[in-house]
């Protein structure tokens, strides 16, 4: 029956007035069966697995990230949009798998989560494939060439990079830009210099920044979520400082001014966590002993929020830590990021129980995809490993140099430099970009040496953009696109070195 359907399409396209639609018939035939033609250009695969099935393996590797995108977006939308402060408190105090499962089954429900998540993600996926497919077909008809299989991967990668609240027409515009400008104008699949999915996201990021950052990470209706958070904060009696919000780790990091120093964060952490020892405790205790003279009977780990703010924002001459009062909120928020408190715990960051772009939240899901891609030989483990090493070492060097240059354990260095290096690997889209974007075989280098340099460069640039550039909360997208630009040059020098060794 399927064969008769395919043959009928071929018969229609063989007629004179429908011959221009031959690429459509060829694409349907190739999708259902093996290719009927031999490739005339790369990639050449001498195997029973053709390019289409090779692309499908990448799609399979994306299954964990896709499922968790649906699951997590459903959970976050139901919790943040509930208007129930008690439900939010229960969610934020989840401390393990047992308590997480208890919360899911008793307070929300699996079906509600999946239904809500599907309503958020599936429309974006359908738009991505539909609009991208139309663009591919139009170019194939006009140029009279085959419809390539590249959209199989681009069509699912692209929606996974988007915030859940993105308007549908913007999502359509982004995938059209990615397919047309970054791929088809360069000659089609296999000829593009930049990653099409990331190019589409970058286009939206710079064209509609208000829809790609800020309060856009939960549910499908930002207004409803804002009203829900206001209701929850009002019910729970929360202030602006300790209230519920939908800020992400990287938003918190990016909004923290250099005026917020490590000593400010350590002082807040020693109070919140009642930690007897923090890296800058000598500076804190020295200042607190002066401040306490005018505030007798107070202990650092027993201060109320108002007293803590008073101590941290008092002038240095009065025994305080000299933070501007307007910066205390930022210092309080970044303390959660640096010390892994509440929703920013390392467990939440690793498993994906946080808000963010649809596919970037779960490092665990990305690792599952990485293992599959490496085992099947599709993605380069060298690029992945060097990317991770570059990011880790760069984050660690920021911390070490801050301590060495400033002294006193970096007490007066910007707090943003002291996020633990390993936590940088869990933040934002680093895991997703490392596994699925940086390893794109078309826009990344092909030589082994070039892959190592390419990964190290992207990892370095990711952390530099995150910690130094105040305009962009996330550095992965820009770092990978910049790496794509330099990939041919890296291959060129790698080949030159290889030839010299042979000579």
From Swiss-Prot:
It comes from the Bacteria. GO terms for molecular function: FMN binding; oxidoreductase activity, acting on NAD(P)H, quinone or similar compound as acceptor. It holds the Pfam family NQR2_RnfD_RnfE. The chain crosses the membrane at residues 55-75, 94-114, 120-140, 161-181, 186-206, 361-381, 387-407, 417-437, 452-472, 475-495. It is found in: Cell inner membrane. It catalyses: a ubiquinone + n Na(+)(in) + NADH + H(+) = a ubiquinol + n Na(+)(out) + NAD(+). Keywords: Cell inner membrane, Cell membrane, Flavoprotein, FMN, Ion transport, Membrane, NAD, Phosphoprotein, Sodium, Sodium transport, Translocase, Transmembrane, Transmembrane helix, Transport, Ubiquinone. GO terms for cellular component: plasma membrane. InterPro entries: NqrB, NqrB/RnfD. The modification FMN phosphoryl threonine is found at residue 248. It is an enzyme of class 7 (translocase). It is a multi-pass membrane protein. Its EC number is 7.2.1.1. GO terms for biological process: respiratory electron transport chain; sodium ion transport; transmembrane transport. The keyword Acetylation does not apply. Its main location: membrane. Belongs to the NqrB/RnfD family. HAMAP family: NqrB. NQR complex catalyzes the reduction of ubiquinone-1 to ubiquinol by two successive reactions, coupled with the transport of Na(+) ions from the cytoplasm to the periplasm. NqrA to NqrE are probably involved in the second step, the conversion of ubisemiquinone to ubiquinol. This is Na(+)-translocating NADH-quinone reductase subunit B. It comes from Chlamydia caviae (strain ATCC VR-813 / DSM 19441 / 03DC25 / GPIC). The gene is nqrB.
């Amino acid at each position: 029956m399927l064969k008769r359907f395919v043959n009928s399409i071929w018969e229609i396209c063989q007629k004179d007035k429908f011959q221009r639609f031959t690429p459509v018939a060829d694409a349907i035939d190739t999708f259902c069966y093996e290719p009927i033609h031999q490739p005339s250009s790369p990639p050449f695969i001498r195997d029973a697995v053709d390019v289409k099935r090779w692309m499908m393996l990448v799609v399979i590797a994306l299954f964990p990230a896709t499922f968790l995108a649906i699951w997590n977006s459903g959970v976050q939308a139901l919790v943040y949009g509930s208007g129930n402060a008690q439900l939010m408190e229960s969610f934020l105090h989840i401390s393990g798998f047992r308590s997480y499962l208890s919360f899911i089954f008793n307070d929300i429900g699996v079906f509600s989560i999946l239904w809500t998540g599907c309503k958020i993600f599936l429309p974006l996926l359908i738009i991505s494939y539909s609009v991208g497919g139309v663009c591919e077909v139009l170019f194939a008809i006009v140029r009279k060439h085959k419809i390539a299989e590249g959209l199989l991967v681009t069509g699912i990668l692209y929606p996974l990079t988007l915030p859940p609240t993105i308007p549908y027409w913007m999502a359509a515009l982004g995938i059209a830009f990615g397919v047309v400008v970054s791929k088809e104008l360069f000659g089609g699949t296999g000829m593009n210099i930049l990653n099409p999915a990331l190019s589409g996201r970058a286009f939206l990021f710079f064209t509609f920044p208000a829809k790609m950052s800020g309060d856009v990470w939960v549910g499908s209706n930002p207004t409803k979520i804002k009203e829900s958070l206001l209701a929850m904060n009002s019910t729970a009696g929360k202030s602006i400082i300790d209230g519920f919000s939908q800020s992400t780790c990287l938003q918190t990091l990016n909004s923290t001014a250099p005026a917020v120093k490590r000593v400010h964060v350590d002082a807040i952490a020693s109070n919140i966590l009642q930690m007897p020892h923090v890296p800058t405790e000598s500076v804190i205790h020295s200042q607190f002993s002066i401040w306490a003279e005018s505030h007798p009977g107070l202990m650092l780990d027993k201060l109320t929020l108002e007293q803590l703010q008073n101590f941290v924002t008092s002038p240095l001459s009065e025994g305080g830590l000299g933070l501007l009062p307007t910066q205390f909120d930022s210092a309080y928020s970044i303390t959660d990021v640096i010390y892994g408190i509440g929703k920013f715990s390392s467990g939440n960051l690793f498993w994906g129980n946080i808000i963010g772009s649809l596919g970037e939240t779960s490092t665990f899901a990305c690792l599952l995809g990485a293992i599959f891609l490496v085992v099947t030989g599709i993605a380069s483990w060298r690029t992945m490993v060097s990317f991770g090493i570059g990011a880790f070492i760069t984050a660690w060097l920021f911390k070490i140099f801050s301590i060495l240059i400033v002294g006193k354990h970096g007490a007066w260095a910007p707090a943003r430099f002291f996020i633990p290096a390993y936590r940088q690997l869990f933040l934002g889209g680093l895991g997703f970009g490392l596994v699925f974007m940086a390893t794109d075989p078309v826009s990344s280098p092909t030589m082994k040496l070039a892959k190592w340099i390419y990964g190290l460069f992207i990892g370095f640039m990711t952390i530099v953009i995150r910690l130094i550039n105040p305009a962009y909360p996330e550095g992965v997208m820009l770092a990978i696109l910049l790496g794509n630009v330099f990939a041919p040059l890296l291959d060129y020098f790698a080949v030159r070195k290889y030839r010299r060794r042979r000579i």
